[in-house]
Amino acid sequence: MERAEKREFVTELNEVFKASGSVVVAHYAGVTVAQMNDFRSKMRAAGGTVKVAKNRLAKIALQGTESEGMTDLFKGQTLIAYSVDPITAPKVVMDFAKTNDKLVVLGGSMGTTTLSVDAVKSLATLPSLDELRAKLVGMIQTPATRIAGVVQAPAAQLARVFAAYAKKDEAA
Protein backbone atom coordinates (compact mmCIF):
# COMPACT_ATOMS: atom_id res chain seq x y z
CA MET A 1 0.00 0.00 0.00
CA GLU A 2 1.26 3.43 -0.83
CA ARG A 3 1.14 6.27 1.65
CA ALA A 4 -1.91 7.95 0.02
CA GLU A 5 -3.79 4.64 0.01
CA LYS A 6 -2.96 4.16 3.68
CA ARG A 7 -4.27 7.64 4.54
CA GLU A 8 -7.49 6.95 2.64
CA PHE A 9 -7.89 3.56 4.32
CA VAL A 10 -7.32 5.07 7.79
CA THR A 11 -9.90 7.79 7.08
CA GLU A 12 -12.40 5.19 5.86
CA LEU A 13 -11.78 2.97 8.88
CA ASN A 14 -12.11 5.97 11.21
CA GLU A 15 -15.55 6.70 9.74
CA VAL A 16 -16.48 3.03 10.21
CA PHE A 17 -15.52 3.16 13.90
CA LYS A 18 -17.53 6.37 14.38
CA ALA A 19 -20.68 5.22 12.55
CA SER A 20 -20.92 1.57 13.59
CA GLY A 21 -23.34 0.36 16.24
CA SER A 22 -20.89 -2.36 17.21
CA VAL A 23 -17.43 -3.56 16.21
CA VAL A 24 -16.05 -7.05 16.84
CA VAL A 25 -12.34 -7.89 16.61
CA ALA A 26 -11.23 -11.48 16.04
CA HIS A 27 -8.17 -13.53 15.07
CA TYR A 28 -8.58 -15.35 11.80
CA ALA A 29 -5.30 -17.32 11.54
CA GLY A 30 -5.99 -20.66 9.88
CA VAL A 31 -9.31 -19.66 8.30
CA THR A 32 -9.30 -20.71 4.63
CA VAL A 33 -10.16 -18.34 1.80
CA ALA A 34 -13.39 -20.24 1.12
CA GLN A 35 -14.40 -20.01 4.78
CA MET A 36 -13.55 -16.29 4.87
CA ASN A 37 -15.63 -15.68 1.74
CA ASP A 38 -18.51 -17.60 3.31
CA PHE A 39 -18.15 -15.53 6.49
CA ARG A 40 -18.10 -12.26 4.52
CA SER A 41 -21.21 -13.23 2.55
CA LYS A 42 -23.10 -14.17 5.74
CA MET A 43 -22.13 -10.85 7.30
CA ARG A 44 -23.12 -8.92 4.17
CA ALA A 45 -26.49 -10.72 4.05
CA ALA A 46 -27.13 -9.73 7.68
CA GLY A 47 -26.25 -6.08 7.02
CA GLY A 48 -22.69 -5.98 8.32
CA THR A 49 -19.17 -5.88 6.91
CA VAL A 50 -15.89 -7.69 7.54
CA LYS A 51 -12.54 -6.02 6.93
CA VAL A 52 -8.99 -7.20 7.37
CA ALA A 53 -6.70 -4.31 8.29
CA LYS A 54 -3.12 -3.85 9.33
CA ASN A 55 -3.06 -3.49 13.10
CA ARG A 56 -1.00 -0.30 12.95
CA LEU A 57 -3.50 1.33 10.58
CA ALA A 58 -6.46 0.16 12.67
CA LYS A 59 -4.89 1.67 15.81
CA ILE A 60 -4.36 4.98 14.02
CA ALA A 61 -7.97 4.90 12.76
CA LEU A 62 -9.24 4.30 16.31
CA GLN A 63 -7.74 7.57 17.57
CA GLY A 64 -10.41 10.15 18.27
CA THR A 65 -13.31 7.69 18.20
CA GLU A 66 -15.50 6.31 20.98
CA SER A 67 -13.98 2.86 20.35
CA GLU A 68 -10.45 3.99 21.21
CA GLY A 69 -10.40 1.68 24.23
CA MET A 70 -10.02 -1.43 22.10
CA THR A 71 -6.60 -0.58 20.59
CA ASP A 72 -4.93 -3.32 22.64
CA LEU A 73 -7.02 -5.98 20.82
CA PHE A 74 -5.10 -5.42 17.59
CA LYS A 75 -2.29 -7.98 17.86
CA GLY A 76 -1.70 -10.79 15.40
CA GLN A 77 -3.90 -11.53 12.38
CA THR A 78 -7.05 -9.59 13.20
CA LEU A 79 -10.24 -8.86 11.34
CA ILE A 80 -12.87 -6.26 12.07
CA ALA A 81 -16.58 -7.08 11.79
CA TYR A 82 -18.99 -4.18 12.15
CA SER A 83 -22.60 -3.20 11.59
CA VAL A 84 -24.94 -0.29 12.19
CA ASP A 85 -27.29 -2.55 14.17
CA PRO A 86 -25.44 -3.24 17.45
CA ILE A 87 -26.54 -6.89 17.49
CA THR A 88 -25.83 -7.99 13.90
CA ALA A 89 -22.02 -8.12 13.91
CA PRO A 90 -21.69 -9.99 17.24
CA LYS A 91 -24.45 -12.44 16.26
CA VAL A 92 -22.94 -13.35 12.88
CA VAL A 93 -19.38 -13.55 14.27
CA MET A 94 -20.41 -15.82 17.16
CA ASP A 95 -22.50 -18.04 14.85
CA PHE A 96 -19.53 -18.43 12.52
CA ALA A 97 -17.12 -19.01 15.42
CA LYS A 98 -19.32 -21.91 16.63
CA THR A 99 -18.76 -23.79 13.38
CA ASN A 100 -15.16 -22.66 12.83
CA ASP A 101 -12.77 -22.92 15.77
CA LYS A 102 -10.04 -21.04 13.87
CA LEU A 103 -11.95 -17.77 14.28
CA VAL A 104 -11.16 -16.55 17.79
CA VAL A 105 -13.14 -13.56 19.08
CA LEU A 106 -10.96 -11.11 21.00
CA GLY A 107 -13.56 -8.52 21.99
CA GLY A 108 -15.05 -5.39 20.52
CA SER A 109 -16.84 -2.17 21.25
CA MET A 110 -20.31 -0.72 21.25
CA GLY A 111 -20.24 3.05 21.46
CA THR A 112 -17.93 4.06 24.30
CA THR A 113 -18.07 0.61 25.88
CA THR A 114 -15.21 -1.79 25.22
CA LEU A 115 -16.57 -5.33 25.10
CA SER A 116 -14.92 -8.48 26.41
CA VAL A 117 -15.39 -11.84 24.71
CA ASP A 118 -18.20 -12.67 27.16
CA ALA A 119 -19.92 -9.35 26.43
CA VAL A 120 -19.78 -10.06 22.69
CA LYS A 121 -21.30 -13.51 23.35
CA SER A 122 -24.06 -11.91 25.44
CA LEU A 123 -24.80 -9.36 22.72
CA ALA A 124 -25.06 -12.18 20.19
CA THR A 125 -27.91 -13.77 22.15
CA LEU A 126 -30.05 -10.62 22.15
CA PRO A 127 -32.73 -10.05 19.50
CA SER A 128 -31.93 -7.55 16.73
CA LEU A 129 -33.42 -4.06 16.60
CA ASP A 130 -35.94 -5.14 13.97
CA GLU A 131 -37.08 -8.05 16.15
CA LEU A 132 -37.43 -5.74 19.15
CA ARG A 133 -39.42 -3.24 17.10
CA ALA A 134 -41.75 -6.02 15.92
CA LYS A 135 -42.32 -7.15 19.52
CA LEU A 136 -43.00 -3.58 20.61
CA VAL A 137 -45.54 -3.03 17.82
CA GLY A 138 -47.20 -6.33 18.74
CA MET A 139 -47.41 -5.29 22.39
CA ILE A 140 -48.88 -1.93 21.45
CA GLN A 141 -51.45 -3.48 19.08
CA THR A 142 -52.66 -6.15 21.50
CA PRO A 143 -54.53 -3.80 23.88
CA ALA A 144 -56.11 -1.97 20.94
CA THR A 145 -57.34 -5.27 19.50
CA ARG A 146 -58.78 -6.28 22.85
CA ILE A 147 -60.54 -2.91 23.25
CA ALA A 148 -62.02 -3.25 19.77
CA GLY A 149 -63.26 -6.74 20.65
CA VAL A 150 -64.86 -5.53 23.89
CA VAL A 151 -66.54 -2.59 22.15
CA GLN A 152 -67.87 -4.78 19.34
CA ALA A 153 -69.13 -7.57 21.61
CA PRO A 154 -72.32 -5.80 22.86
CA ALA A 155 -73.26 -4.79 19.32
CA ALA A 156 -72.79 -8.35 18.13
CA GLN A 157 -74.93 -9.64 21.00
CA LEU A 158 -77.68 -7.16 20.12
CA ALA A 159 -77.55 -8.24 16.49
CA ARG A 160 -77.93 -11.89 17.53
CA VAL A 161 -80.91 -11.00 19.76
CA PHE A 162 -82.60 -9.10 16.91
CA ALA A 163 -81.92 -11.98 14.53
CA ALA A 164 -83.45 -14.42 17.03
CA TYR A 165 -86.58 -12.22 17.37
CA ALA A 166 -86.84 -11.98 13.58
CA LYS A 167 -86.67 -15.77 13.22
CA LYS A 168 -89.19 -16.17 16.02
CA ASP A 169 -91.62 -13.75 14.30
CA GLU A 170 -91.19 -15.54 10.95
CA ALA A 171 -91.85 -18.90 12.57
CA ALA A 172 -95.01 -17.65 14.25
From Swiss-Prot:
Which GO BP terms apply? translation
Listed disulfide bonds for this chain? none
One Pfam entry for this protein is: Ribosomal_L10
InterPro entries associated with the record: Ribosomal_uL10 (IPR001790), Ribosomal_uL10-like_sf (IPR043141), Ribosomal_uL10_bac (IPR022973), Ribosomal_uL10_bac_type (IPR047865), Ribosomal_uL10_CS_bac (IPR002363)
Checking SUPFAM superfamilies in the record gives: Ribosomal protein L10-like
Please verify whether the record's keywords include RNA-binding: yes
* Protein keywords: Ribonucleoprotein, Ribosomal protein, RNA-binding, rRNA-binding
**Gene3D superfamilies according to UniProt:** 3.30.70.1730, 6.10.250.290
This entry carries the following GO cellular component terms, namely:
large ribosomal subunit
* GO molecular-function terms, A-Z: large ribosomal subunit rRNA binding; structural constituent of ribosome
The entry's family comment says: Belongs to the universal ribosomal protein uL10 family.
PANTHER family per UniProt = 39S RIBOSOMAL PROTEIN L10, MITOCHONDRIAL
Q: What is the role of this chain?
A: Forms part of the ribosomal stalk, playing a central role in the interaction of the ribosome with GTP-bound translation factors.
NCBIfam families per the UniProt record, alphabetical: PRK00099.1-1
User: Subunit structure, per the record?
Assistant: Part of the ribosomal stalk of the 50S ribosomal subunit. The N-terminus interacts with L11 and the large rRNA to form the base of the stalk. The C-terminus forms an elongated spine to which L12 dimers bind in a sequential fashion forming a multimeric L10(L12)X complex.
Q: What is this protein called?
A: Large ribosomal subunit protein uL10
| Organism, scientific name | Allorhizobium ampelinum (strain ATCC BAA-846 / DSM 112012 / S4) (Agrobacterium vitis (strain S4))
Per the record, the gene is rplJ
